[in-house]
Amino acid sequence: TGVFSERGIKAALAGLAPYIFEPERLAYGLERLREIAHRGGITTIGDMGIGGYLGLDRELELLRGAFENDATSFRLFLVSSPWGLPAGMDQKLIRDFATRSTSRVRTGKHVKLLADGGFFAQNMRMNFPGYTDGHQGKWMMEPDELMSAARSYWNDGYQVHVHVNGDEGMDVTLNVLATLLEEQPRPDHRFTLHHVGY
């Protein structure tokens, strides 16, 4: 027995993927998603981090197969994330992915990056005094890695979304934004913070 969290999902997926992504189970789940969206009158749904489980191409193919048809009355907006993509290939794959919109399954120049960990698992990064038991939380992307990735996409005109929870994670993320605005101002950048747990 053991525990995995955050990026540990990569190791766990090796054993879980055949069950979780079994084709009939996946098709059933996507059909249920369509039913729920229809019942709720939802016109647009989104996936803020596609590509991390099966890869951008496979996930896009699955979603198009499920929703690019007349039985679907909503749009699906997909934002790619480099965290599960092959190192060194992520930017090329994401840039290609951004051009692959269809009428119902939309892509675009958006990317989701990950600063610190989740709040439920107490993996968000906290400033002093931090956690009462002394643990530190986790970086999903080290601050310099976050800066480098954000700069690359920002300079290419992407809207940058960042998963951030703790106040230390927030400080790092806001410093990234301040640096980007100083280096290459963009008045309508729409830099977006996701979750903001603390």
Regions found by a protein language model. Name each.
Residues 57-60, 170-178:
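Histidine/acidic-residue-rich catalytic or RNA/ligand-binding cores of hydrolases
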Residues 63-64, 94-95, 178-181:
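Short, hinge-like loop/turn segments at secondary-structure boundaries
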Residues 1-78, 102-154:
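Catalytic pocket of metal/acid-base enzymes, prominently hydrolases
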Residues 117, 163, 193:
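Conserved hydrophobic/aromatic pocket- or pore-lining residues that grip, position, or stack substrates
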Residues 152, 175-183:
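Conserved helix-loop functional segments at active or binding sites
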Residues 68-111, 190-197:
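Phosphate/diphosphate-binding loops
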Residues 50-53, 80-84, 166-168, 197-198:
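Active-site-proximal loop/turn and secondary-structure-junction residues that shape catalytic pockets
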Residues 158-168:
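Short acidic/histidine-rich active-site segments
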